[in-house]
A protein has these predicted regions:
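A sequence-composition feature that detects small, non-aromatic residues
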Residues: 11, 18-21, 51, 81, ...
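Helix-turn-helix/homeodomain-like alpha-helical modules used for DNA recognition
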Residues: 68-101
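Intrinsically disordered, low-complexity and often Lys/Arg-enriched segments
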Residues: 1-2, 99
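Short, well-ordered alpha-helical scaffold segment located
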Residues: 19, 65-66
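Major-groove DNA-recognition helix of helix-turn-helix-type DNA-binding domains
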Residues: 23-60, 67, 83-88
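Polyanion-binding surface elements
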Residues: 2-37
Length: 101
């Protein structure tokens, strides 16, 4: 007798404010501050405009963008150190967090 199993993995590229706060163990106030800072990075060209989606009371953030921002936040906030921040390459970051091989 053969048994066939199927593993199904789902990765959603966007995450809500509440889920960010829960997953990263930070307050909603900290999440809102980081979203504001990410929007500034969108204006500077680091991230695409769809990195943060806002529709009414719903705010979703691209998961990979949030992780990248957390990794590079201190450098990006310092005008002298920001040139040393690693470039944002979503495919490499996705591999690093195990989304795909």
């Amino acid at each position: 007798m053969n048994i066939t199993t199927i593993n199904y993995t789902r990765a959603c590229p966007y995450i809500s404010r509440a889920n960010i706060a829960d997953q990263f163990s930070i307050s909603l106030g900290s999440v809102d501050k980081r979203i504001k800072e990410i929007k500034q990075e969108i204006e500077r060209g680091r991230y695409k405009t769809n990195a943060v989606i806002k529709d009414g009371g719903i705010v979703l953030v691209n998961y990979l963008v949030f992780i990248d921002y957390e990794i590079n936040r201190q450098k990006l906030l310092d005008s002298n150190a920001r040139k040393y921040a690693e470039p944002y390459i979503p495919s490499e970051l996705a591999k690093d967090i195990g989304w795909y091989n």
